[in-house]
Amino acid sequence: MKGAILALSLCLCGITAAQEAPAPAAPAEFSEAERDQQLLDSYAAQPTLENAARILGLASLDDENGTYRMGFCSQLIRQHSVHLNELLEKAGGADSPAIRLHICTCCWLADTPESNKAAATILKYDPIIEAWSRIKPGTPKPDFTKLEELTSEPMEAMALDMAWGAYDATRRRDILSSFIRCGTRTAAPEKPRKLWMVTDEQRARAAKAPNGIDVVSMAAKWSVQSRAKADAAFAAEVQACLSTMPADVQNRWKAPLPDYPQNESEYTPNPE
């Protein structure tokens, strides 16, 4: 999940320590990352076209939260699909290949008639993006392109990140329920579908997992429970979702997470 770093600098000057107490510290300026995060956090309550455009213009695939933001932005593209041309114009980023690639990817994932047309247009007139994205106009779309497949039950770590982005953009209870299903499943998928934008190097790293451990399931459960501890309103949403689920799911949710080996020698690459 996401986090923020707060930096505070203070310089005090007084006549004497006995005569004058230190003045209150001036409020620190928010960092750019914190301002971006505040915009993301407040979007679900104010899903306006203007806020959507600001968020869409923020992110790139090179960002450390890039996959989270892809899920987030794919959802807001869906919300404003009727006004997509205006949204993309407001988002800007014409001089940034990274942002154009990010927008193109999000349009594919959103999978609406308007967003598919926008993605095809970007690819047709932007040879740099065509080369980066490894998609050529007129070829079939990648197999893994729809938000429903990201959010129905995340099967890869990057899909889980994207699903969290889609949830934070909408606060949809069905997505939260999918995290609970993922966190309580009794077996990992035999052949999880792969995200087309994941590089071979990223996939090789993600394939390393301890024997018998469904790391995505663990991550889903840990991330929900961690947020619930810090956010009472979110905790209430979790309980509302759990109350609709079978007793065995509720019991597995209450069970402690298994120990996760810390020694890399205990990791065994999963078969492709």
Could you say what each language-model-derived stretch is?
Residues A4-G14:
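Bacterial N-terminal signal peptides
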Residues Q19-E272:
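Non-catalytic all-alpha helical scaffold/repeat segments
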